[in-house]
């Protein structure tokens, strides 16, 4: 068992001291970026980006990754895992060689694009070339960028596989494969695409998996393509985010959820909020109904054109829009710091999605409130979530506005 963590301070600082990591024997805790053996021009980029001290997961995972080890790193949203990936990749890549050397796969276009942005920012002084290879964007642009030469591809499995099969994305120089949100990638529909990509990669390959939740069956699967991985794990019981107050509102019927939501709008002053529905159709229906009742909301789901999704994300990220209604496409790892309230209009279809949704409301230690709308038949799901995460979800108090 590794020692308790040292907290990171700086923009979006998180108090890490309550996180306890279960790590492989011999994993060092490196308390400063300067001690990691990172090149000077990369350090400049890290500090320019606003980091002062590594987060708990960064303190443990960066050194094994840049040393060439296979790594399974479990870290919840908001612990700095995207910047950990970016930092490690920037250190490993030889920028003098204009070939793809690292491939990062993510379950959503938005997460892949965010990884590209963070890596370009951190790697600014080393002139790293990164391309987000994602569906919904022009194949012609992918072909142009890849033929011009990039060091890193951050992409979604479908588009990356397509580019490899077209022989536009050449894999001969790839030495590092990173699967971000590995539970989503391997456990829920992406497994075949991952294996398709993996078959085209060189045999001497370093593989890293990073995710907020790593169920037992996912860990078993890693034995197929990882060699003696270093494990850096958060105890499951501690995956509930500190500082997030979780409540439920009992609603007798589905129709009552809408009235409850309107009541909350009247009583809460919200900086920014995300409302989750389980289906795209429900997102469209709720958005239309809210707007017809003179509430200003934006909406996003996977059927929308990529350009429209980018515009909506940009507006929400900048604070131009305050309330976003969405499906779980938004729930995994997207970095919008101002979100103070998450409403689960529908409880998620599985308990592991719950933490990805709730993680939105308290990133890097920001306090947050999560409110779950619960019908009678949902009580069992709610209790299952409570038990799984060893947490307590209380009935929403009258003074909930004071907690946001």
From Swiss-Prot:
Superkingdom of origin: Eukaryota
InterPro entries (UniProt xref): DEAD/DEAH_box_helicase_dom (IPR011545), Helicase_ATP-bd (IPR014001), Helicase_C-like (IPR001650), P-loop_NTPase (IPR027417), RNA-helicase_DEAD-box_CS (IPR000629), RNA_helicase_DEAD_Q_motif (IPR014014)
Record field: catalytic activity: ATP + H2O = ADP + phosphate + H(+)
Domain Helicase ATP-binding, residue spans: 62-232
Record's subcellular location: Nucleus; Cytoplasm
Keyword Hydrolase attributed: yes
CDD domains assigned to the protein according to its UniProt record, in alphabetical order: DEADc_EIF4AIII_DDX48, SF2_C_DEAD
GO biological process terms on file: mRNA splicing, via spliceosome; mRNA transport; nuclear-transcribed mRNA catabolic process, nonsense-mediated decay; regulation of translation
SMART domains linked: DEXDc, HELICc
Tissue: Expressed in roots, leaves, flowers and seeds.
Disulfide bonds: none
Descriptive protein name: Eukaryotic initiation factor 4A-III homolog A
Species whose genome carries this gene: Oryza sativa subsp. japonica
């Amino acid at each position: 068992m590794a020692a308790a963590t040292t907290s990171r301070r700086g923009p979006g600082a998180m108090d890490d001291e309550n996180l306890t990591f279960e790590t492989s024997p011999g994993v060092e805790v490196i308390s400063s970026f300067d001690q990691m053996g990172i090149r000077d021009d990369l350090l400049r980029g890290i500090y320019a980006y606003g980091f002062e001290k590594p987060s708990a997961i960064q303190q443990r995972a960066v050194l094994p990754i840049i040393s060439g080890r296979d790594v399974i790193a479990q870290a919840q949203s908001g612990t700095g895992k995207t910047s950990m990936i970016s930092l490690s990749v920037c250190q490993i890549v030889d920028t003098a060689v204009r070939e793809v050397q690292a491939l990062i796969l993510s379950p959503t276009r938005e997460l892949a694009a965010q990884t590209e942005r963070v890596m370009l920012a951190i790697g600014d002084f080393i002139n790293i070339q990164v391309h987000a290879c994602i569906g919904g964007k022009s194949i012609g642009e992918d072909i142009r960028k890849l033929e011009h030469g990039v060091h890193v591809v951050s992409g979604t499995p479908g588009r990356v596989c397509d580019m490899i099969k077209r022989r536009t994305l050449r894999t001969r120089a790839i030495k590092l494969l990173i699967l971000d949100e590995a539970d989503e990638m391997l456990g829920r529909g992406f497994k075949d695409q991952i294996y398709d990509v993996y078959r085209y990669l060189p045999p001497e390959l370093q593989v890293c998996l990073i995710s907020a939740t790593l169920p037992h069956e996912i860990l078993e699967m890693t034995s197929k393509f990882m060699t003696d991985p270093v494990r850096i794990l958060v105890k499951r019981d501690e995956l509930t985010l500190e500082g997030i107050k979780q409540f439920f509102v009992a609603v007798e019927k589905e129709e009552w959820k809408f009235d409850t939501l309107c009541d909350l709008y009247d009583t809460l002053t919200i900086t920014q909020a995300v409302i989750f529905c389980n289906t795209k159709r429900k997102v469209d229906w709720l958005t239309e109904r809210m707007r017809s009742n003179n509430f200003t909301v934006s909406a996003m789901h996977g059927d929308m054109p990529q350009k429209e999704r980018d515009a909506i994300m940009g507006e929400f990220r900048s604070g131009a829009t305050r309330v976003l209604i969405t499906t779980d496409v938004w729930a995994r790892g997207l970095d919008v710091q101002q979100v103070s309230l998450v409403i689960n209009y529908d409880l998620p279809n599985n308990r592991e999605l719950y933490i990805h949704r709730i993680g939105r409301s308290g990133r890097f230690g920001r306090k947050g409130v999560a409110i779950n709308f619960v019908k009678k038949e949902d009580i069992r799901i709610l209790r299952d979530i409570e038990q799984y995460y060893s947490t307590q979800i209380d009935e929403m108090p009258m003074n909930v506005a004071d907690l946001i």
